[in-house]
A protein has these predicted regions:
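Conserved core of the PLP fold type I
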Residues: 49, 54-201, 210-211
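N-terminal "arm"/small-domain region of PLP-dependent enzymes with the aminotransferase-like
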Residues: 1-64, 71-74, 78
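Conserved Walker B
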Residues: 206-207
Length: 211
């Protein structure tokens, strides 16, 4: 039998634990004080509006719902970004964040000829599994200081500077998983400069936009 997913498998262990004072710190799902997933008011309102429109349900375009894709572009880059106005961004709706990572890595490998990738040390465990499944080798670049209390940016940027061209670099856009420690705006500018100069391919995982 296949082993349990190292992250989602914790949910099964949590549910089997009979202690009343247990706390679930596994999968990042918002729970109320009763330990239940609440129906957020914004979700309830969105569902009400969709129901009241009485629109037919049919197949979406291959790239996803156009209005959703356009909204994502504006959310990520800002509605006034020149690339948004020029219509030069390609956006594809996927089955969740894992699906986006899988599609991005597969596209890079199959159509751009990317063979190597690097992820931060530490990173979300599934990053490595997804990239390997898509045929990429996976290395690591340093991210934390020796006492694991801050980002070791000097070590990180030094490692990025010696990567071979055409390496896929997994970066965490915000709320780094699992540390929560993020780069400053100035550090991001330096990373962008190195990525451009070294001809690297950045893949930015932005699972926690707004945090």
């Amino acid at each position: 039998p296949m082993p349990d997913d190292p992250i989602l498998g914790l949910v099964s262990l949590y549910q089997a634990d009979e202690r009343p004072n247990k706390v679930n710190l596994g999968v990042g799902v918002y729970l109320n004080e009763a330990g239940k997933v609440p129906l957020l008011e914004v979700v309830e309102e969105a569902e009400r509006r969709m129901t009241n429109r009485h629109q037919p349900r049919t197949y979406m375009p291959m790239s996803g719902l156009p209005a959703y894709c356009q909204a994502v572009q504006k959310l990520v880059l800002g509605k006034d970004h020149p690339a948004v106005a020029a219509g030069t961004i390609a956006t594809v709706q996927t089955l969740g964040g894992t699906g986006a990572l899988q599609l991005g890595a597969a596209f890079a490998h199959q159509f751009l000829g990317i063979q190597e990738s690097v992820v931060s040390d530490p990173t979300w465990g599934n990053h490595i599994a997804i990239f390997k499944a898509d045929g990429l080798s996976v290395g690591k670049y340093p991210y934390l200081s020796a006492d694991r209390s801050a980002v070791d940016f000097d070590a990180m940027i030094k490692a990025l500077k010696v990567l071979p061209p055409k390496t896929l670099v997994l970066l965490h856009g915000c709320c780094h998983n699992p540390t929560g420690l993020d780069l400053t705006h100035e550090e991001w500018r330096e990373v962008a400069q190195v990525v451009a100069e070294k001809d690297l391919l950045p893949l930015i995982d932005m699972a926690y936009q707004g945090f």
